Amino acid sequence: MEAGHAVSSSLGRIAISSDAIAQIVGHTVPECYGVVGMAARGRVGRLLPLERLKQAITVGGGPEGLRIDLYVVVEYGLNLAEVAATIRSRVAYEVERLTGLTVAAVEVHVQDVRASG
């Protein structure tokens, strides 16, 4: 992950690490409706425990703002596009609210579907 992303004001500059942003995402995604868990990229069928959620999240930056990729497992029987849209919206809102940084894109990769419970 990148070393940091900056927010500047008249009082100075604040650097926010990609790991800190990934932690925000890691706390936000499991609370979204339809998410069973998160999975490491390319690892179908293996849910990650809370302490390893950063393996399911990639944070990058560009001139337009942050780009966040995340890998999820969605509950079977739900509309995947609707669940992904909810995740995108919620992640962008929480990251912008908590960091002051602009989120340019949130890419949701559905790694698997499974019954909840």
Regions found by a protein language model. Name each.
Residues 93, 97-98:
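Conserved amphipathic alpha-helical interaction elements at protein-protein interfaces in regulatory
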Residues 1-80, 85, 101-117:
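Contiguous, often N-terminal, cationic amphipathic patches that form binding interfaces
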Residues 87-90:
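Hydrophobic alpha-helical segments of small multi-pass membrane proteins
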